Amino acid sequence: MKMKKLMMVTLVSSTLALSGCGAMSTAIKKRNLEVKTQMSQTYWHDPVSERTVWLQVKNTSDKDMSDLQSLIAKDIQAKGYTVVTSPDKAYYWIQANVLKADKMDLRESQGWLNRGYEGALSGAALGAGITAYNSNSAGATLGVGLAAGLVGMAADAMVEDINYTMITDVQISERTKATVTTDNVAALRQGTSGAKIQTSTETGNQHKYQTRVVSNANKVNLKFEEAKPVLEEQLAKSIANIL
């Protein structure tokens, strides 16, 4: 009986320690804010003496990004360009739209989130195993085993790896001396089973390029209020560095 109790105490103690390992590891590794920005496509342009830019920033996400245009304009000006209010007077057009700025789970692709949850789940499972082994005190042992699992779950709940992602589509238009012909094709839905193909052709004096900028902010227990300024800063630098 004493040996069984000793083994039970040892197992429960080990469970309590292991259940908090995932949370402790997360807290240590993710204690500092990490920000990464990537662009889906590279935009190349020939060097020219013209250094005027017309900037248009839209936001179709559900987050407030009212300061974003001024931040981007400031970084563009820091590179020696003049931001103008009239598109007709600009050599470059930069148009950006924030599609989404929200919490996104990137840990599944990295295989990191699943390891974090194993601590709590193993505690609950081990509690059931102890109950089966110690049949003489099943009720008491079940309570201890469940408590071990709940401690692990509580620790994991208090320490959460949070990642916020901002997705922005960018279109760059560059004036050219050549005549540019653009063919537009659009498929318009007609009800649930049909579609209408709409085509048009236009001529102009601009080459247009499109890319997507994805910015991530990652930290333990991160709040959007903390992530927002660094996400905006990274996006502004990325767009300005196109020029």
Swiss-Prot record:
Gene name tied to this protein: traT
Keywords tagged on the record: Cell outer membrane, Conjugation, Lipoprotein, Membrane, Palmitate, Plasmid, Signal
Primary location group: membrane
Position of the signal peptide: 1-20
UniProt keyword Oxidoreductase, yes or no: no
Lipidation positions, renumbered (N-palmitoyl cysteine): 21
Topology in membrane: Lipid-anchor
Keyword Lipoprotein: yes
Function recorded in the entry: Responsible for preventing unproductive conjugation between bacteria carrying like plasmids.
InterPro entries: TraT_complement-R
GO cellular component: cell outer membrane
Lipid linkage positions (S-diacylglycerol cysteine): 21
Subcellular locations according to the entry: Cell outer membrane
Protein family according to the UniProt entry: Belongs to the TraT lipoprotein family.
Name assigned to this protein: TraT complement resistance protein
Coiled-coil annotated spans: none
PROSITE patterns: PROKAR_LIPOPROTEIN
